[in-house]
Amino acid sequence: CLTDSVTRACDALGPDHPDTLASRNSLAGAYRDAGRLDKAIALYEQNLEDSIRVLGTDHPSTLTSRFNLASAYRAAGRLEEAIPLYEQVVAGRSRVLGPDHRSTLTARDDLAATYWEAGRLDEAITLKKQILADAMRIMGPDSPGASTARLNLAATYRDAGRLDEAVNVHQQ
């Protein structure tokens, strides 16, 4: 049981040990997966606060904690709380891991999707255009990643009522 694992880690290693933080993050993920978003969010919030204090703002584990909290906020429909966290994750992962790292690209894609869900279509389009250009550069224009990015951009243009641009993206 994950709650036992967190308790054991806390007792053996202390509440601020990186393994204890990782165990708490896993427990929060289990709560999220079980649909218990309130418990997940509370645990993610505490874990992020502790990770920043113990590991620092740009530590990869802290960036993961921030990403997980943003994802939980998004799942709970708390989009305006998720967006600044995703923006911080994108900036941090770009600095720490590089702009082309898979984790950075994942965060950018989730940020773009959250912009879209929040009705911030212009911001979603701008970011999705960058994602498509990067996917074509990194993976190749005919790669599955570029195809997915192309479809996502076209759908966002469609939702924004920019149908000619949606068709043009599909025809690329």
Q: Residues of each region from the PLM?
A:
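Intrinsic-disorder-linked linear interaction elements in eukaryotic regulatory proteins
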Residues: C1-Q172
